[in-house]
Amino acid sequence: MAGGRHRRVVGTLHLLLLVAALPWASRGVSPSASAWPEEKNYHQPAILNSSALRQIAEGTSISEMWQNDLQPLLIERYPGSPGSYAARQHIMQRIQRLQADWVLEIDTFLSQTPYGYRSFSNIISTLNPTAKRHLVLACHYDSKYFSHWNNRVFVGATDSAVPCAMMLELARALDKKLLSLKTVSDSKPDLSLQLIFFDGEEAFLHWSPQDSLYGSRHLAAKMASTPHPPGARGTSQLHGMDLLVLLDLIGAPNPTFPNFFPNSARWFERLQAIEHELHELGLLKDHSLEGRYFQNYSYGGVIQDDHIPFLRRGVPVLHLIPSPFPEVWHTMDDNEENLDESTIDNLNKILQVFVLEYLHL
C-alpha cells in the first residue's frame, strides 16, 4: 500500500459515479455477455454448522504459517530486487508442494517507472482453470522502496507480507477440501478458486496513475482481452471473476474493516456473521464483539489499491483493508515485532470459513 493518505482516497461523488458506470465499463464485463457470468449475482453460500467451524479452527495453524509462510517474506522485496525474486520463488514453492493441483502462471512484463523500465511479475495460481467462475483472493507481494535507514530496511509486514502468508496458509489448511475442485460435477457449481499475488502495487516515488498499481493494471487489461472459457466469443477472464477479495494492510492489532461497495455488501455481511459465530463458539482469541473487525458502517470513498483496475472493468470487489490504516503504515516499524498473532489467527479462521462457504465445500 503506497502513497499519501490524501492521495489514496477518492471522494464519495467520484465513487458513486464510478459504481454507476460499472455495468457499461469498456473492455470488461458487458451487459450483452452470455448467461453464465450472471450466476455470481444470485450465488448463495453453503452455511457451515458449528461442527465444521470447529474443524476449520483446529485445522489452521498460526505457528506454522508464521514460520513457513510469513518469515521468509519479511525481507526487502521491491520490484526487480533480489528479495522480490526470493519472495516470488517462496510463494510458488509453497503452492507447488500442495496436493490440490494448483496451476501456476507468471505474468512478467516491462513497464516504464520513474527509474526507467523495470520488470514486474504477477503470480496467478488457479484451481481448475477450466471452471467458468472463480472466487479470487488477492494481495500484493512487493514492498515499497525506501532507502536504508540506520541499517534497517522496509519489510512491509502488514503491507503486504501478512496477507500473502494468510493466502498461503489458507491453501495449506484447506488443501484436502480444495482437492475436490479439480473436477466439475453436476452436484456443484462450475466454480473454483484463484489466488493472485500482484507485483508493483507500490509507487517508486509519488503515488500517481502512472506510478502505482503496475501489476494489477497490466493483469486486468490482459484478462479483459483473454477469452474465457478458451475460444469463447464475448466473454473474457474478467467475466469469470465472481468476486475479487483483496487483502491489504493486515496484521496490526484491533483492525476495523468497513464495507466499501454496495454490490458486495451481502458478502461483507457474511464475514460479519462468520466472525460472530466463531466468537460465540469461543474459537477466536482475545476477541470481543465490541471490538469486532467487520463494522456496521460504509466507507465514504474508495481507497486506491490493486482492485481499482478490476473495479473499473465491472468486477465485484470485497476490499479487506482496515480503516484507519495501521499506525506503522509506511514506516520502518511495519515489521514482525509489531504484528498481532491473535488478530492474524482470527482473520485466518474467518477467511477460511468464508472461502469454504462460498465454494460449497
Curated annotation (Swiss-Prot):
Q: What is its main location?
A: secreted
Substitution effect: D248Q: Abolishes activity
The record's section on Pfam families has: Peptidase_M28
Q: What is the effect of changing D305 to A/E/L?
A: Abolishes activity
SUPFAM superfamilies assigned to the protein according to its UniProt record, in alphabetical order: Zn-dependent exopeptidases (SSF53187)
Among the GO biological process terms of this entry, one is: peptidyl-pyroglutamic acid biosynthetic process, using glutaminyl-peptide cyclotransferase
* Compartment(s): Secreted
**GO CC term, one of those recorded:** specific granule lumen
- Provide the catalytic activity annotation: N-terminal L-glutaminyl-[peptide] = N-terminal 5-oxo-L-prolyl-[peptide] + NH4(+)
A molecular function GO annotation: zinc ion binding
Q: Which residues form the active site?
A: E201, D248
**Where is Zn(2+) annotated to bind?**
D159, E202, H330
What keywords does the record list, in alphabetical order?
A: Acyltransferase, Disulfide bond, Glycoprotein, Metal-binding, Secreted, Signal, Transferase, Zinc
Which residues pair up as cystines? C139-C164
Described purpose of this protein according to its UniProt entry = Responsible for the biosynthesis of pyroglutamyl peptides. Has a bias against acidic and tryptophan residues adjacent to the N-terminal glutaminyl residue and a lack of importance of chain length after the second residue. Also catalyzes N-terminal pyroglutamate formation. May be involved in the N-terminal pyroglutamate formation of several amyloid-related plaque-forming peptides.
What family does the entry list? Belongs to the glutaminyl-peptide cyclotransferase family.
What name does this protein carry? Glutaminyl-peptide cyclotransferase
Species, as recorded:
Homo sapiens (Human)
